[in-house]
From Swiss-Prot:
Subcellular localization: Cytoplasm
Region (Domain II): 74-108
Region (Domain I, interacts with DnaA modulators): 1-74
Name of the protein in its database record: Chromosomal replication initiator protein DnaA
Length: 447
């Protein structure tokens, strides 16, 4: 075999002869051979559920077919697309061609599946999508930096990769780099240890578009924040585009230096909220079409009604239903979907935690009156429980900052931010307070 693609293609043909069409299409049709490391073939699956199923159910069959194709015993390792960055870093570097390139340019690490074409637009992400497209069409001219925030699995990373792909498609010479703040931190630490700080700086200050994910993780890391501050200034000063994502807006990231916070606010800040029902159905339809699946509308509606948290869980539920159908050899309908998802959908949704409920529990714990939360008193015996209640309101409810402030005597949203940051910092060092907070959370969840 000349390459691993041919090897895997030949192996898949043999596997297809051994399985039913639904089983093959569900589990193996969308797999891809990514690398061959010594005696281990790295195979990517479309999602975590498929990866786990392949490991548990098909490892022996795949190994047997690989033996027939290659004449050698090969091990297998199953990964998902998010793991490809790690694999790329482990591959031996090819012999470089003669070039004026210094070798300092990092790889872009863009996921080919995350483009604007595959992004489903809805009410919760429409503005973020429009801003991302504007930045992609005119880097460093529309909004710089672009700061996208929102919960896990809502599409922040998808939009960042989409920007990267668009820029590279329209300007192949552009140096586009995507990485997480954790990777930035780890590379920076390694550069210091290896006495290669200048190499690190050249690497990230000589690019055209920087996409950095989960920036909240550099909070509290003074040296990393210092380095990123200068990287930001160098790129921005040269009119290079910077796109940043986080799980919260800059003003709510605790222990983030003010100078970074202010720079993150120079451009445009946009959020992504959980998809509404119509968007969830559209996401499921697009996923089904991409996977070549024919799913009844009633099943799409059922899944969309049951899974309303984020896109990853939504798509995972769809794959789970398809997998279950293949396993039990039954057609997909709403009843089968309910059986397939019964382990991940609670029989009854947990009761919503409200700010008044938080105030009642905190008042009882700290022996204050409910009216003290709205009072102007600033004594420690009142102010501290009030800050605890504000912190819990921010952590456990979907209420906006102004709404929380309103529930505490009409206080300004900045007071809520201050309370949340103060308690967050205290929790890092005060184990007794951490224990108290956890007990309060458990009480609230059991109401």
């Amino acid at each position: 075999m000349e390459n691993i693609e041919e090897l895997w293609s030949a192996t898949l043909k043999k596997i297809e002869e051994k399985l039913s069409k639904p089983s093959f299409d569900t589990w193996l049709k969308n797999t891809k051979a990514e690398a061959l490391e010594k005696d281990t073939l790295i195979i990517s699956a479309p999602n975590e559920f498929a990866r786990d199923w392949l490991e548990n159910q098909y490892t022996n069959l795949i190994s047997q077919m690989l033996l027939e194709v290659t004449g050698s015993e090969l091990n297998t390792k199953f990964i998902i697309p998010d793991s490809l960055e790690e694999i790329e870093e482990q591959k031996p570097m090819p012999k470089p061609k003669q070039s004026t390139d210094t070798g300092d340019s990092p790889k872009s690490m863009l996921n080919s599946k995350y483009t604007f074409d595959t992004f489903v637009i809805g009410a919760g992400n429409r503005f973020a999508h429009a801003a991302s497209l504007a930045v992609a069409e005119a880097p460093a001219k529309a909004y710089n930096p672009l700061f996208i925030y929102g919960g896990v699995g809502l599409g922040k990373t998808h939009l960042m990769h989409a920007i990267g792909h668009y820029v590279r498609d329209h300007n192949p010479n552009a140096k586009v780099v995507y990485l997480t703040s954790e990777k930035f931190t780890n590379e920076f630490i390694n550069a210091i240890m290896d006495n290669k700080s200048n190499h690190f700086r050249n690497k990230y200050r000589n690019i055209d578009v920087l996409l950095i994910d989960d920036i909240q993780f550099i909070a509290g890391k003074e040296s990393t924040q210092e380095e990123f501050f200068h990287t930001f200034n160098a790129l921005h000063g040269e009119s290079k585009q910077i796109i940043i994502s986080s799980d919260r807006p800059p003003k709510e990231i605790p222990t983030l230096e003010d100078r970074l916070r202010s720079r993150f606010e120079w451009g445009l800040i946009t959020d992504i909220t959980p998809p509404d029902l119509e968007t969830r159905i559209a996401i499921l339809n697009k996923k089904a079409k991409a996977e070549g699946l024919d799913i009844p509308n009633e099943v799409m509606l059922y899944i969309a009604n049951q899974i309303n948290t984020n896109i990853r869980e939504l798509e995972g539920a769809l794959i789970r239903v398809v997998a279950y159908s293949s396993l039990v050899n039954q057609d997909i309908d709403a009843s089968l979907a309910a059986d397939a998802l019964k382990d991940i959908i609670p029989s009854s949704k947990p009761k919503e935690i409200t700010i008044p409920a938080i105030q009642e529990i905190v008042a009882e714990r700290y022996h204050i009156r409910l009216e003290d939360f709205a009072a102007k008193k600033r004594t420690k015996s009142i102010a501290f429980p009030r800050q605890i209640a504000m912190y819990l309101s921010r952590e456990l409810t979907d209420a906006s900052l102004p709404k929380i402030g309103e529930e505490f005597g009409g206080r300004d949203h900045t007071t809520v931010i201050h309370a949340h940051e103060k308690i967050s910092k205290m929790l890092e060092q005060d184990t007794e307070l951490d224990r108290d907070i956890e007990e309060l959370k458990e009480k609230l969840k059991s109401i």
